[in-house]
Amino acid sequence: LQAKIDAAADNATITLDSDTTITETLVITGKTLTLDLNGCTLRMTGTGSVLKVSGRATLTITDSRPQNPHTGSDAGLPAGGVITGGKADKGGGILLDGGCTLKLTGGCITDCHAIGTVGGGVVLNGDTAILYMSGTARIENCTAGETWGANAIFNSGTMYADGGTVDGTVNNQGTIRLSEGAAAETVFNGTVYNRSAGTIKAGRYNETVENRGTITGGTFCGGVTDDGGTIEDGAYETVKFNSDNGAQAKEEKVLRGQKVSNPAAPTKSGHTFTGWYLGDEKYNFDTPVTAPLTLTAKWEKVPSSGGYYYYHPTTDTKADDTKGSPKTADPGVALYAALSLLS
């Protein structure tokens, strides 16, 4: 396979036609190349990264048969193209040097290991290294000497989190962002350590982000632990509570992906509060907030109380009534009846 890589022209595509075993790291240098895993397994049995990208090269990894099952000794591997078995000081799966670009659009990097502390799956080795992750690409079941050293990805460059899934810890000392016009975001299913030099601008984080750096965007379903970092306004959504009782609407900022707290019930004279509504639906406060919201209070009128009122004078100004004379009116006696109507 290395001979094919060396002989390939710039912008060529190499397609695996069978499961492939290597004993030394495959090196792509000084050219733009696409590797189609084609549902096959690329397995390292020696020591070193499975792939190394150097010399300002660009490597795109695709998988034209993502549902292809594996059999025999590989039966336990995920379906589709797989990169596996790497064992290196750093970057067990792929080591990406500064000035190089890696585009992961398909396939799975699994069961790769960093013997040292850094990056079992992929390492961006320098601030000019660039990773684009999108499509059905996955990184899973990789390890490093220390979990903070990133089982899955160690990033000191720029990662464009345009899709795909990362299972395992990530150490970010560079930037995680979104490509302009990207329709999807990478899902991170492990703890992300955002170091002091790190910036997170995009991505969906289902586990905790430990933040020493800067967060300007993203969706944080697992929450953020403040470790001396900064979270800017772009990472928050505004929830407006319109109580519809004459009081000014209240606003609350919520970290995107977190839940807004159910506030104390408002009051309105002559009415009973029935809940907060988003449009015509009663709002579920267990729902993560991912966009600006306006919640409106709904009210029911309280039935007004009613009854009869009878008034009798305490004195009578007439000494006697003329017997047998009909009374058409008596100014000293009043009878008032009020009937309540439900409204």
Residue ranges of predicted features:
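Juxtamembrane low-complexity tails/linkers enriched in Ser/Thr-Pro and polybasic
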Residues: 318-328
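Beta-strand-rich solenoid/repeat architectures in extracellular/passenger domains
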Residues: 39-47, 64-90, 105-118, 134-151, ...
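Extracellular beta-strand-rich solenoid/capping regions of secreted or surface-exposed proteins
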Residues: 21-34, 42-63, 83-102, 116, ...
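Tight coil/turn sites that cap or link beta-strands
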Residues: 11, 17-19, 32, 39, ...
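Acidic Gly/Asp/Thr-rich repetitive segments characteristic of extracellular carbohydrate-active
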Residues: 1-17
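Secondary-structure capping and domain/repeat boundary segments
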Residues: 232-311, 316-319
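Extracellular/surface recognition and adhesion modules
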Residues: 4, 16, 35, 61, ...
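A cross-kingdom C-terminal cell-surface attachment/processing module
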Residues: 332-343
